[in-house]
């Protein structure tokens, strides 16, 4: 039986479902989740491991110390490990290098048929340099900064120099990477996100409670708040709907800063949660909402899409980057031109007034990941 390793530096929810898909094909998968001992809360998106031993190095997850995630793979050849660093801080580089050396030597000694490294943080270059003589594939969720237009990073340059294989989650990011790899040194391919199913293993009540004074649909904007995500466009959309006297509710949730946040805070039909969201809060917000909004100015891809679709929430989005690859206009969402506030307002209003359309798009959202998208 073939045996592969997946080493995930963040992006756990996307790589955990990949491990399941590969294991269902009869391939043994050893999954390594890189975590930080100093700032460890006992959970990352998709894995609750608070019962696991707390020391640096490799810790195997079992049905005793991580029953939910181990149950997710029941009957499948998947082995789960924590790859615990001392700290993600660069001030402890020496200690981390010792942990890396010990763990990566164990991984090399396992003689895997293939190794997939997920993530692009600077520490990944240490892993790459130790494992570059193995049958190595990198998965990058982003290439540079799509907002600043920066493509190259030291890690990207190293991967291209060493002619590694690379997986990208969207055609948009694949095109960006191939622009960077102008000589075609790397074998690069596009594999989309699967369902972020493991998030649903840990649903629990949350202290966060939101109530509106009407029964109008609830629209949700969530995730890290950054200028390219278009809250200024959404402000113009809200003003248009208010002028039309259309009733709706809006939640703006996530950490970050934007000059339009005071506008939303003053609106009676809007709730602003300007901080980092816990997983249970993110799931609660999706539970109580009807539609998710992505008024982005630019985008490569977004984990918001598969997360929202799990809850059956259709998405209204602008036609930028990879958003058009997963959101199908009239099937699981509505797509409008970038910076077109009137069309975005029209899309929101259509879902407020047309329950048949709302039901159709919710059904389409739930079908995401079933092979028909």
Regions from the PLM with identified roles:
Residues 296-298:
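Aromatic "clamp/platform" in nucleotide-sugar-dependent glycosyltransferases that forms part
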Residues 291-294, 314-317, 327:
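Short hydrophobic beta-strand element within catalytic cores of glycosyltransferases
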Residues 161-202:
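Donor nucleotide-sugar binding/catalytic pocket of nucleotide-sugar-dependent glycosyltransferases
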Residues 212-229, 235-238:
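Conserved donor-binding/catalytic core segment of Leloir-type glycosyltransferases
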Residues 306-307, 320-330, 334-335:
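Short acidic/histidine- and often glycine-rich active-site loop of Leloir-type glycosyltransferases
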Residues 343, 350, 357-372:
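A short, well-ordered alpha-helix in the C-terminal region of glycosyltransferases
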Residues 260-284:
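Nucleotide-activated donor-binding/catalytic signature segment of Leloir-type glycosyltransferases, i.e.
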